Amino acid sequence: DHTGAQYILGRINDEGMRTNPDPAEAVKWFRKAANGGKAEAQFALAVSLERGEGCVINLEEAVNWYTLAAEQGHASAQFNLAGMYAHGCGIMADDEKAVYYFQLAAEQAVASAQCNLGAMYEQGSGVEQNFSSAMHWYELAAGQGLCRAQYNLAVMLHAGRGVAADLKEALVWYRQAAKQGHAAAQYTLARIFLHGEGMDVDEVIAAKWLKLAAEQDVPEAQLILADFYLRGRGVPEDFVLAYVWFNRASSHGLDIAEKNKRQAARCMTPEQIAQAQEISRTHLAA
């Protein structure tokens, strides 16, 4: 199979398996194999054209090669092509076509495709809105460990969209997503523990999740965490850290954070303010 050999030569040059990577040489071999009908090469060539690796960016040609690979059943090509249709990259935006190709990839167990398809069913984009179908695809993607799908599934269970509200099950998925670093899931968990939704209030656990979300730059989490430090709720009282987090929240345009920062400063020594400002400079530069 000469197309297979051409594709392998492309991979060798692309990844530098035996030599230094040579993207332009890789594209040459990918194109030869792609013209011979090899789906993997068509996909690899499309990726190169989309990213401008070893060639000039050409989104229209990338769409053409993704389409040829997708029609041969290449799951990643189907997923990428769906994204091109969804965002109007290299082709006119078409939500129905996006749904079609996401569905093909989703049926081949591509977790991100399952999640995106779920979102399109939930929103009614390119397909009739159907919460049951949205849940189905979110569940499949969540079961594969995709944190975005775990969060979306939790939100639907929490709100009772298409199913009876089930906070207990929602919490399972919020936790799964939060443990993987999903900022919105971390913030939502913090609010659930803070308000005692379906459980006793636990400000210590709320503070734990607030810290994680705040570190990921969720402004509302930063604001609440700052207030926790100011009042010693769930964490030891610490005016310096209160000032730092009010400052972080203020940098996102939250006026109340700027006001609260000034109030916190009234309780602080000049040395504490200087320390807080230095920490803030380090934080904001990071």
Language-model region placement:
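Residue-level recognition of tetratricopeptide repeat
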Residues: H2, K38, H74, V110-S112, ...
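Terminal, low-structured helical/coil segments at or just beyond the last alpha-helical repeat
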Residues: L254-A286
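TPR/TPR-like alpha-solenoid repeats
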Residues: I12, A33, S48, A69, ...
